[in-house]
Amino acid sequence: MSNIEERVKKIIVEQLGVKEEDVKPAASFVDDLGADSLDTVELVMALEEEFDTEIPDEEAEKITTVQAAIDYVSKNQ
């Protein structure tokens, strides 16, 4: 597991209050991890802070799964 993947998963666990073993690459924040729209906004903000990047709204809307978050951060580091 890459450092980025570990950090993204840690943020998801902290922000959504889910178990680490539930944070699988294909897991949807809303459908599988029980996030609501506010949770997803806060999650994006936490990712921006952790990785010192800015995620535009149109990109943030596409980040709906754990793998999508990992991929976005990996490409935009």
UniProtKB/Swiss-Prot annotation:
Pfam families hit by this protein: PP-binding
GO molecular function: acyl binding; acyl carrier activity
InterPro entries referenced in this protein's UniProt entry, alphabetically: ACP (IPR003231), ACP-like_sf (IPR036736), PP-bd_ACP (IPR009081), Ppantetheine_attach_site (IPR006162)
BP-aspect Gene Ontology terms: lipid A biosynthetic process
Top-level taxon of the source organism: Bacteria
Keyword Lipid biosynthesis: yes
The keyword Transmembrane helix belongs to this UniProt entry's keyword annotation: no
Carrier domain boundaries: 2-77
Residues where O-(pantetheine 4'-phosphoryl)serine is found: 37
Location(s) in or outside the cell: Cytoplasm
Protein name: Acyl carrier protein
